A protein has these predicted regions:
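Active-site nucleotide/adenylate-binding loops and adjacent lid/helix of ATP-dependent enzymes
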Residues: 1-10, 72-75, 83-188
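Conserved N-proximal alpha/beta basic substrate-recognition cap immediately N-terminal to
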Residues: 10-122
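Short, solvent-exposed loop/turn segments at secondary-structure junctions
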Residues: 13-15, 59-60, 85, 150-151, ...
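Short, solvent-exposed coil/turn linker segments
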Residues: 36-38, 161, 198
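Generic hydrophobic/packing signal
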Residues: 80-84, 153-155, 192, 198-201
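Beta-strand scaffold of nucleotide-dependent catalytic cores
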Residues: 168, 180, 188-205
């Protein structure tokens, strides 16, 4: 009987992937083996050498996202679900959380600082000037300025004043950004959900 194969798809990080591979192989015995995923090109014959793939990098590599979706369509179990990446919109996620009475920080979605590719002034004739005084009064300081899409702590700024805010906003290029009330916390947790059934809470230090 063939061993179950668990592949890890990862990028620049070195510590976690190799430690996880070692831990899985130590515990898996004769039934399971873990290894780095190896990809060259993708054929449409739905042939994949893995039973499970743990994804740590596809949010940064579109080619990997497509590979993962093809693997999932072929029966490979993917963690995390690559389809959810297309729903990775922090502002919308906040609204969903509010709808089920989860407390979230006050948040404002902001226009792009610069024109996105293939747009010009006429592309934004529906836009009106932002009343920054209203935004700052609604959120208070300090404010976190962060991209509305994606993660990895990229392009995240903590702003203690309007001057700091505008200096940070000027650096955001054509990203869709959101401004968020800063919450001073006593404890910080990350919640991991597997298969929509198993939930694991972990203490985490975002600093």
């Amino acid at each position: 009987m063939r061993k179950k194969r668990i592949g890890l798809l990862f990028g620049m990080e070195d510590t976690f992937p190799w430690a996880l591979i070692e831990a899985i192989n130590r515990r898996g015995g004769h039934d399971v083996e873990a290894m780095p995923v190896e990809i060259s090109y993708i054929k449409d014959d739905r042939t994949f050498d893995y039973d499970v793939v743990l994804d740590r990098i596809s949010h940064e590599v579109p080619f990997y996202r497509t590979w993962l979706k093809c693997a999932m369509a072929s029966g490979v179990r993917i963690i995390n679900n690559p389809i959810w990446w297309s729903a990775d919109d922090k502002f919308f996620d906040n609204l969903v959380a509010q709808s089920v009475r989860v407390a979230v920080p006050r948040t404002v979605l902001l226009p792009h600082k610069r024109y996105p590719p293939n747009t010009e002034a006429k592309s934004f004739r529906n836009m009106r000037w932002v009343n920054w005084d209203e935004v700052f009064a609604y959120l208070g300081f300090p404010i976190f300025l962060k991209p509305a899409h994606g993660g990895g702590w990229k392009d995240v700024y903590k702003c203690n004043s309007a001057e700091e805010f505008f200096a940070a906003y000027d650096q955001t290029r054509d990203l869709a950004m959101m401004a968020q009330e800063a919450i001073e916390f006593d404890s910080y947790f990350r919640c991991y959900v597997v298969g929509r059934k198993r939930v694991h809470l972990m203490r985490y230090d975002p600093k």
